[in-house]
UniProtKB/Swiss-Prot annotation:
PANTHER family: VOLTAGE-DEPENDENT CALCIUM CHANNEL SUBUNIT ALPHA-2/DELTA-RELATED, VOLTAGE-DEPENDENT CALCIUM CHANNEL SUBUNIT ALPHA-2_DELTA-3. The gene is CACNA2D3. A divalent metal cation binds at D262, S264, S266. Residues 1090-1091 are cytoplasmic. Glycans are attached at N166, N309, N553, N632, N793. Disulfide bonds join C412-C1055. Only detected in brain. Not present in lung, testis, aorta, spleen, jejunum, ventricular muscle and kidney (at protein level). According to PubMed:11687876, it is brain-specific, while according to PubMed:11245980, it is widely expressed. PROSITE patterns: VWFA. This is Voltage-dependent calcium channel subunit alpha-2/delta-3.
Length: 1091
């Protein structure tokens, strides 16, 4: 398809082939001489097009008017250089106060819970009708409320994304595998009812709070505000608060763990499957402050990951998943030599502790086996007695109890716990027992450590799946504290009652950051004590495969993976170590879906956020990004110009805090400012400095509205409706928009709308057109076409923007950017018209873009095509179309290649999978398998016929097959940037049988280049240059080094691994299958057989 305005006929291809054949025959083996493309003609075309398109852009954007208006105020403004160190300290202080408010709310819940429990006396016969979150408002067939399902008033609340909630009461969720009326549950629910008034009081004190909750050690979960819980698509609510990170982190101290798995011959079949699931469940309970290794043993030791022989590794998600994959490779044979395994485990813990790299706190050995023939007291005497600093937790797999006594003795003699796991359904409940044992020293110390989790998306809560913003699921951190029994008679037992917590959306942090003080490219970011990102504009949580999905390792992205130019981790390590200081480096920031790169120098300022494990950093780009100016106008002037209908403000910026009072939550930021300035809402808290600058920008930019309106009303202007939108944005987040066509006629309906995150002011960055314009020479326009997210670029518009500077010098801040969006067809027609001009008096041009022998292109400073005779090439990278020419431009220095790295990429990988074995590691499949196993046992008991092997075979005997999945990976890819100093150049490329000539000429006052290429020489021997990312593959030895490598981290400040007064007599016993459990499972059995 020919581009708009290109007159080339469809028969050209055939004619060209015939001419080429005749020419080749005439020349034989003689290399053809290249066609000479006159530079002067191309220069004329470029000048004509540049003048025309700049005239249009300047006229319709009003750039000259706006520049003039700011110049008029030049003497009335004060320019300041931003003090980055003072700025980051102030921001850290603001965040510290915000975090402190959240932790104080949690502390009040702790005090109330402990007081209520102290006053309560356990009553095994207690009958209490509580609000069960699953059953509330449910009726039977006669219309009566179900038991525990009383009427519970719910109303949509805008603070909770309009979810129906009850802000007067909490309700209670009980795990599916637990009995709703178990005496322990009923008693716990009864005394914890007193938390309701504290929940409400906390919300009154701090209306920005969202979910508050108490997770009981008995398993129930009390949540405020109360909400109805709905089962997932499988009819199950798998949530158990005790295996959530906030619960585990608050309940226990950091730990070093060695997991020993018996793989002797007696562990074959279902026992090994249960053992693997037990290991997987233990891994689920380990967090970023823990360290672990897994050793399988029979007559020999088999490290699950041989590379990590004799050491421990951090329990981050990546490492845990790596070990899970290796679990599938375990198989049972031989005899079990537990003494060898225990010796190895003790030695590893001792050696690793001496390196100073681990948790330097709790230590434990987890033993998973179907029996032990000895108590191995000589080993314990050698390594662990009398202090018993290493706890032994033993898990007996299977129904036989012949060797239970030895395993129980080992656990009890080493301050551990013994459990028996007979079925897959038993795994999770039994694994979690060890957490409450590890919590004992903390409880005895009565140390209510405040813990903050890493950033995460909690999608297990039904309401959390709906609590999303425009960008997808809400990223949050949780502040939590443990709740202890204060009854004197149980003090030495160290009884943990549970954990209280509240969620803090990360966007709450961003509200404390004055984006206008950070400059166009500036940003704030925060990391945890492990160096993982809490918030950073480059953190990408989701990937797209059919629909948007969470990346598996999104919560453990290290700062060094986004600020990758800091190869020595200088910035990262200083922040992890809670230093205050400054660091500078050249950075390569990608924009526009990673296809373009801006090279700049950033100054980083950092400090710690006291009372939390977090550190805060601020990045300011050198040059205009380091300067700020203050203008001054009267409130009356500013208010008048804010009333104009074309004015809007950045909704994600905090001009006024509308969260403090419920009556303000419905206000937009612009509405809040107007009420504040008019004195109608004295309770509104606003940023006076920012609002003063908003008023200044509103006054200075106000005349442009009338200017745009006059253009729109002039019928002789823009008659072909080529220019559709004019827009401006200022450093304060103020925007103005004018449509030159009806809204329904806009080619790009999404432009500047809330969903168009790249092109509007948001919490992370200025609009793309603003950022790119700021890097252009003042007075010039930057032109671009938006990239489609799909495989084919469907853009039909061109965006042009330019920056407005206050002063004609380098330190001048960029105060605003203005631009237009026009139809691509209109833009391309202007190009083709300009390319027909020539200086010849007789009107006969020596060369034309209409000629068969040349191809004409218009490309931007990153090498992307805006105009080509083949319309389908629009938006493509020039190197993919003209590889030989792009290669020559790189060699000549007209363009330079910049290598970029993506450490958050997702790559396709072929994995060998067995639906059965791997599926068992999924909780739901595991549960279904458990139900099948229990049913088998019942059948065994009733008919004494072994159906187990038959029933279980469908879960294990499925053939291995290759499955293609997307997995986290590292990639390398190029970006290209033009050299500004080179305005024009010509070149010749020696190909196999011809010489290819070309001319490249910069379009004046723009980021564009006209490229005219000799098309008679195809030069197919030179491969196209692509921008496709290449996966960085690591060989086995490098993979091993990366596994072993441990970046600098800071351990949590508190540790409660041991207490001499601990009463370790409660150390477990063999559970029995209760009738009530069978009754609970019957509905699930029916569901299973109906599938």
């Amino acid at each position: 398809m020919a581009g708009p305005g290109s007159p080339r006929r469809a028969s050209r291809g055939a004619s060209a082939l015939l001419a080429a054949a005749l020419l080749y025959a005439a020349l034989g083996d003689v290399v053809r001489s290249e066609q000479q493309i006159p530079l002067s003609v191309v220069k004329l075309w470029a000048s004509a097009f540049g003048g025309e398109i700049k005239s249009i852009a300047a006229k319709y954007s009003g750039s000259q008017l706006l520049q003039k208006k700011y110049k008029e105020y030049e003497k009335d403004v004060a320019i300041e250089e931003i003090d980055g160190l003072q700025l980051v300290k102030k921001l850290a202080k603001n965040m510290e106060e915000m975090f402190h408010k959240k932790s104080e709310a949690v502390r009040r819940l702790v005090e109330a819970a402990e007081e209520a429990h102290l006053k309560h006396e356990f009553d095994a016969d207690l009958q209490y009708e509580y609000f069960n979150a699953v059953l509330i408002n449910e009726r039977d067939k006669d219309g009566n409320f179900l038991e525990l399902g009383k009427e519970f008033i719910l109303a949509p609340n805008d603070h909770f994304n309009n979810l129906p909630v009850n802000i007067s009461l909490s309700d209670v969720q009980v795990p599916t595998n637990m009995y709703n009326k178990d005496p322990a549950i009923v008693n716990g629910v009864y005394w914890s009812e007193s938390l309701n008034k504290v929940f409400v009081d906390n919300f009154d004190r701090d209306p920005s709070l969202i979910w508050q909750y108490f997770g009981s050690a008995k398993g129930f979960f009390r949540q405020y505000p109360g909400i109805k819980w709905e089962p997932d698509e499988n009819g199950v609510i798998a949530f158990d608060c005790r295996n959530r990170k906030w619960y585990i982190q608050a309940a226990t101290s950091p730990k070093d763990v060695v997991i020993l798995v018996d793989v002797s011959g007696s562990m074959k079949g279902l026992r090994l499957t249960i053992a693997k699931q037990t290991v997987s469940s233990i891994l689920d309970t380990l967090g970023d402050d823990d360290f672990f290794n897994i050793i399988a043993y029979n007559e020999e030791l088999h490290y699950v990951e041989p590379c990590l022989n004799g050491t421990l590794v951090q329990a981050d998600r990546t490492n845990k998943e790596h070990f899970r994959e290796h679990l599938d490779k375990l198989f049972a044979k031989g005899i079990g030599m537990l003494d060898i395994a225990l010796n190895e485990a003790f030695n590893i813990l001792s050696d690793f502790n001496h390196t100073g790299q681990g948790s330097i706190c709790s230590q434990a050995i987890m033993l998973i086996t179907d029996g032990a023939v000895d108590t191995y007291d000589t080993i314990f005497a050698k390594y662990n007695w009398p202090d018993r600093k290493v706890r032994i937790f033993t898990y007996l797999i299977g129904r036989e109890a012949a060797f239970a006594d030895n395993l129980k003795w080992m656990a009890c003699a080493n301050k551990g716990f013994f459990t028996q796991i007979s079925t897959l359904a038993d795994v999770q409940e039994n694994v979690m027992e060890y957490l409450h044992v590890l919590s004992r020293p903390k409880v005895i110390d009565q140390e209510h450590d405040v813990v903050w989790t890493e950033a995460y998306i909690d999608s297990t809560l039904p309401q959390a799946q709906k609590l999303t913003d425009d960008q997808g699921p809400v990223l949050m951190t949780t502040v939590a504290m443990p709740v202890f029994s204060k009854q004197n008679e149980t003090r030495s037992k160290g009884i943990l009652l549970g954990v209280v917590g509240t969620d803090v959306p990360v966007k709450e942090l961003l509200k404390t950051i004055p984006k206008y003080k950070l400059g166009i490219h500036g940003y704030a970011f925060a990391i945890t004590n492990n160096g993982y990102i809490l918030t950073h504009p480059e953190l990408r949580l989701l990937y797209e495969e059919g629909k948007k999905r969470r990346k598996p390792n999104y919560s453990s992205v290290d700062l060094s993976e986004v600020e990758w130019e800091d190869r020595d981790d200088v910035l990262r390590n200083a922040m992890v170590n809670r230093k205050t200081g400054k660091f500078s480096m050249e950075v390569k920031k990608t924009v526009d879906k990673g296809k373009r790169v801006l090279v700049m120098t950033n100054d980083y300022y950092y400090t710690d956020i006291k009372g939390t494990p977090f550190s805060l950093g601020v990045a300011l780009s050198r040059g205009h990004g380091k300067y700020f100016f203050r203008g001054n106008v009267t409130i009356e002037e500013g208010l008048h110009d804010l009333e104009h209908p074309d004015v809007s403000l950045a909704d994600e910026w905090s001009y006024c805090n509308t969260d403090l009072h419920p009556e303000h939550r419905h206000l937009s930021q612009l509405e809040a400012i107007k009420l504040y300035l008019k004195g109608k809402e004295p309770l509104l808290q606003c940023d006076k400095e920012l609002i003063q600058e908003v008023l200044f920008d509103a006054v200075v930019s106000a005349p442009i509205e009338a200017y745009w309106t006059s253009l729109a009303l002039n019928k002789s202007e823009n008659s072909d409706k080529g220019v559709e939108v004019a827009f401006l944005g200022t450093r304060t987040g103020l925007s103005r928009i004018n449509l030159f066509v009806g809204a329904e006629q806009l080619t790009n309906q999404d432009f500047l709308k809330a969903g168009d995150k790249e092109n509007i002011f948001n919490a992370d960055h200025f609009p793309l057109w603003y950022r790119r314009a700021a890097e252009q020479i003042p007075g010039s326009f930057v032109y671009s076409i938006p990239f489609s997210t799909g495989p084919v670029n469907k853009s039909n518009v061109v965006t042009a923007s330019t920056s407005i500077q206050l002063l004609d010098e380098r330190k001048s801040p960029v105060v605003a950017a203005v631009g237009i969006q026009m139809k691509l067809e209109f833009f391309q027609r202007k190009f083709w018209t300009a390319s027909r001009q020539c200086a010849s008096l007789d009107g006969k041009c020596s060369i034309s873009c209409d000629d068969e022998t040349v191809n004409c292109y218009l490309i931007d400073n990153n090498g992307f095509i805006l105009v080509s005779e083949d319309y389908t090439q629009t938006g493509d990278f020039f190197g993919e179309i003209e590889g030989a020419v792009m290669n020559k431009l790189l060699t000549m220095g007209s363009f330079k290649r910049i290598t970029l790295y993506d450490y958050q990429a997702m790559c396709r990988a072929n994995k060998e999978s067995s639906d059965g074995a791997h599926g068992l590691l999924d909780p739901y499949n595991a549960f279904l398998s458990a139900v099948k196993w229990i049913m088998t046992e019942l059948v065994l008991f009733l008919v004494e016929f072994n159906l187990c092997s038959w029933w279980h075979s469908d879960m294990t005997a499925k053939a291995q097959k290759l499955k293609q999945t997307l997995e986290p990976c590292d990639t390398e890819y190029p970006a290209f940037v033009s050299e500004r100093t080179i305005k024009e150049t010509t070149g010749n490329i020696a190909c196999e049988d011809c010489s290819k000539s070309f001319v490249i000429q910069q379009i004046p006052s723009s980021n564009l280049f006209m490229v005219v290429v000799d098309s008679s020489c195809l030069c197919e021997s030179v491969a196209p240059i692509t921008m496709a990312p290449i996966e960085i593959r690591y060989n086995e030895s490098l993979k091993c080094e990366r596994l072993k490598a441990q970046k600098i981290r800071r351990r949590p400040e508190s540790c409660h691994g041991f207490h001499p007064e601990e009463n370790a007599r409660e150390c477990g016993g063999a559970p029995s299958l209760q009738a009530q459990t069978v009754l609970l499972l019957l509905p699930l059995l029916l569901m299973l057989f109906s599938r």
